[in-house]
Amino acid sequence: MNEATPKAPGPRSLQRATRRPVRVPGADAVTIGFLPEAPSTPALVTPDGPGVDLPGWLRSNRDAVEARLLRHGAILLRGFHRGSVEKFEQAASAVCGTLFREYGDLPREGESERVYKSTPYPEDLSILFHNESSHLPQWPMRQFFSCIVAPHTGGQTPIVDCRTVLDRMRPELAELFATKKLRYVRNFIDGVDVSWSRFFGTDDPAEVERKCAEEGTSFEWTPDGGLRTSRQAEAVLRHPVTGEAVFFNQLALHHPSSLDPETRSSLLAICGDQGMPRNVFWGDGSVIDDAVVTEVRDLMDRESVAFTWQEGDVLVIDNMLVAHSRSPFTGPRKIVVALGDMTGGSVPTLSSVSSV
């Protein structure tokens, strides 16, 4: 795949880019194009014939794959092999080298230490848009998904370009996110969500305290043996490679308005704002109005694209350029996940979006 490295354009440039499939000749010939239902992202790569080894192809074309990711934010690799956790891990490793193996927010896939199951959540509910680990001091620049078993209906993993989201957000609201930032408050309660021991990878409270102090996360042990953490994080960042401003956070996923009204009312009555399993505030601790979250959520939904999973599909995303979600589904569904190129701390921040 001897492609010149393409310059990464902004979201408006993406809309003007050609959408005709391009055949890349060679021993492992592939065609690069787009899905009819998703004309700007993800880029679709399919083999021109049988026998193209996906991990080998990715290793041979790593620079071109990286350039495509920076341009489109996501790549869908389809038709290379049947659903296989082993092949998936090899493919992800071909792109990133070392995969992250200490992520406490996802259950580990039993076949591998570097592959995770997707988020366990009721099949009839949506998981809202978020950038993986954007509420934490470290996050993966690359996230991989693969379909091992396709659901009967639904179960898509919609994606949305975070450059476009910021570009089309009301300027006043974008400025608020850049200047006020966000504060994530999390309560680790036995039997609700993930436990603090699994999240931190230790049963030792002293080790948890050490990790929190190292990450700049405030913490408090509750009388019932639970743990409350609070951490301020950016809502808008600059991509460290392209320099583009991106809307990068877990606002929709953590805000109480993401819950159904009955569950939200019950949890608030029992726990209060500060006792919810997950919550997000403005950086100064003030409450974010539901209307703000609804506006952002509606914008992300409008700009999103989705495709139907096929067994063996591998989706690669730039976790800062693209946010993802999950649609409700019926039937068995097995989507596995891998994370790579961990970063954080040195990523450029924005004190204002007025000059973007």
Predicted regions mapped to residue ranges:
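Basic- and aromatic-enriched surface patches that contact anionic nucleotides/nucleic acids
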Residues: 135
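A gly/proline- and charged-residue-enriched helix-loop-helix capping module
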Residues: 99-131
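Glycine-rich loop at the start of a catalytic domain that most often binds anionic cofactors/ligands
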Residues: 82-97
